[in-house]
Regions:
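Non-catalytic propeptide/linker segments at domain boundaries
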Residues: 1-25
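Glycine- and acidic-residue-enriched helix-capping/strand-helix junction motifs
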Residues: 37-52
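Extracellular repeat turn/loop positions enriched in glycine and acidic/polar residues, especially those
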Residues: 31
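Active-site-proximal helix/loop segments of hydrolytic enzymes
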Residues: 15-18, 49-210
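A short acidic, helix-capping loop that chelates divalent metal ions and anchors anionic groups
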Residues: 36-38, 182-183
Length: 210
């Protein structure tokens, strides 16, 4: 992963404040970071893939005139509460959290996108989730796990995922692939492929907000 990180380090990652570009604002949230590595397998660490995929998404969106704010642009620890507080404070048009999945038996595979429960019958986040998923599948032969909502076991009226549940803004969470699945990661095994994944996520966002 170090080669992927070094090849992507040249990306412009300075967070931009809202309003500078004159376009819509997107908040990109690379999952985990710092002392929270996320999933890992064979030396691959989720937090690194999340960040580098997010850098590519940011680069693409900025090239298209979007104003992009990253919750983190380095390998630092950031709580879920801080991520959503930043979103609720800066009020982007869309919050997108980027992750790589994992499974206990290493049998999980494919790509999926979670969106807000309130949009289950149609709405912004369902549209965004659909567009991101379609764009990823356009370039990667991953299993289509679909777009999904997930509810709290204790309250079926609330989103399970904190960054969706506690976020006042439209928000989705992308699980790009299973980090512990050899077939999945064989499709994303170079800096170019990581960049392509991030670009496809960016295209899905662009499709939704243009």
């Amino acid at each position: 992963m170090s080669s992927i990180a070094s090849s992507l380090s040249k990306h412009n990652t300075t967070p931009t404040e809202p309003g500078n570009s004159g376009g819509k604002t997107v908040m990109i949230d690379p999952g985990h970071g710092g002392s929270a590595p996320g999933n890992s397998s064979g030396g691959m660490i989720e937090k690194d893939y999340n960040l580098n995929t997010s850098l590519a998404t940011t680069e693409y969106l900025r090239s298209k005139g979007f104003n992009v704010i990253m919750t983190r642009d380095t390998d630092k620890t950031l709580s879920l509460g801080n991520r959503t507080a930043l979103s609720n404070s800066l009020k982007p048009d869309l919050f997108t959290s980027i992750h790589y999945n994992g499974s206990t038996n290493k049998q999980g595979h494919g790509v999926e996108v979670f969106y807000k429960l309130k949009d289950k019958n149609g709405g912004t986040t369902k549209t965004v989730a659909t567009n991101i998923l379609n764009r990823i599948l356009e370039k990667f032969k991953l299993t289509n796990r679909g777009i999904k909502t997930r509810v709290l076991p204790s309250d079926s009226t609330k989103d399970y995922l904190y960054v969706l549940r506690s976020n006042d803004m439209p928000a989705v969470l992308v699980e790009c692939a299973f980090l512990d699945n050899e077939n999945d990661m064989s499709l994303i095994n170079s800096s170019a492929k990581v960049k392509e994944m991030g670009t496809q996520i960016g295209k899905g966002i662009e499709d939704s907000l243009k």
